[in-house]
Amino acid sequence: MSKNNENIKHQNNDKVNNQVDKKETKNHNKQEFKYKELYEHELKKNKELQNINTLLKDKNQQLEEQISQLNQDFIKQLETKAKQAQQILEQKVNELEARHEAKVNDAVFKIFKFKMEPLLDAINHFTKIVNQNYDDPKIQAFIEGFKMFSQNMIDGLDNLKITKISPQVNDSLNDEIMEVFEVVENTNKPSMHVVEVISDGFKYNDKVIKFAVVKVAK
C-alpha cells in the first residue's frame, strides 16, 4: 500500500513538474514574443528616424542651395546697382566738368572778343605790312627780319586756341566768318564773291571773335 502511495505521489510530482515546465515554456515564449515585438518596434522606429534624418539632410541641403543662390543673386544685384551708381556718378561728373568748361570757354571767349580786338587789329596790320613786296631792296631786306616775329605772334595766338580766318579771293561770301566792307561793281566776278581781303579774322575754339573783312562783287 505504501508503494502505491509512493507511485501516486511520484506521478503527482511529475504532473506538477510538467505543468510547471509548460507554464515556464509558455511564459518564456510569451517573453520571447514580447522581446521580438519590442525589437521590431525599435527597428521600425530606428528606420523612421533614419528616414526623417535623411529627409532633414535633403531639406537642409536644399535650403543651403537656396541660400547660396539667393546670396549669389543678391551679390549680382549689388554689383549691378554699384555699376549703375558708378555710371550715374561719372555721367554727373562729366556733365559738371562740361558745364564748367563751357562757362570757362565762354568767359575766355568774351575776354578775347571784347578785350583783344586792338591787339588782333595790330597783329593783322603788322602781318599785312611784312607780307607785302617792296620795290626798294633795302626796305624789303629790312622787312624780312620781321617776318619771323610776325609768325611768332601768330603761333602765340595758336597756343591760346586762337586761329586765323583767312578768306581767299574768289571765295563765296560766308557771313558766319566774314564781314562785308564794300560791295564792288563791274568786277567780272560772281555776285557775293570775295574780290579783296581787307583783314583776316580770328576764332577761339571755333567761335568767331573777329570777323574777316572783305570786299565782294555786287
Swiss-Prot record:
Keyword rRNA-binding among record annotations: no
Biased composition (Basic and acidic residues): 1-13, 20-32
UniProt keyword list: Chaperone, Cytoplasm, Stress response
Biological processes per GO annotation: protein folding
Matches recorded under InterPro entries: GrpE, GrpE_head
UniProt main location, coarse: cytoplasm
Pfam family for this entry, one: GrpE
Gene3D superfamilies for this protein: Head domain of nucleotide exchange factor GrpE
GO cellular component: cytoplasm
The keyword Chaperone is assigned to this record: yes
Span list, region Disordered: 1-32
Location in the cell: Cytoplasm
GO terms assigned for molecular function: adenyl-nucleotide exchange factor activity; protein homodimerization activity; protein-folding chaperone binding
Superkingdom of this protein's organism: Bacteria
HAMAP family according to UniProt: GrpE
Family: Belongs to the GrpE family.
Quaternary context: Homodimer.
Function per UniProt: Participates actively in the response to hyperosmotic and heat shock by preventing the aggregation of stress-denatured proteins, in association with DnaK and GrpE. It is the nucleotide exchange factor for DnaK and may function as a thermosensor. Unfolded proteins bind initially to DnaJ; upon interaction with the DnaJ-bound protein, DnaK hydrolyzes its bound ATP, resulting in the formation of a stable complex. GrpE releases ADP from DnaK; ATP binding to DnaK triggers the release of the substrate protein, thus completing the reaction cycle.
Name assigned to this protein: Protein GrpE
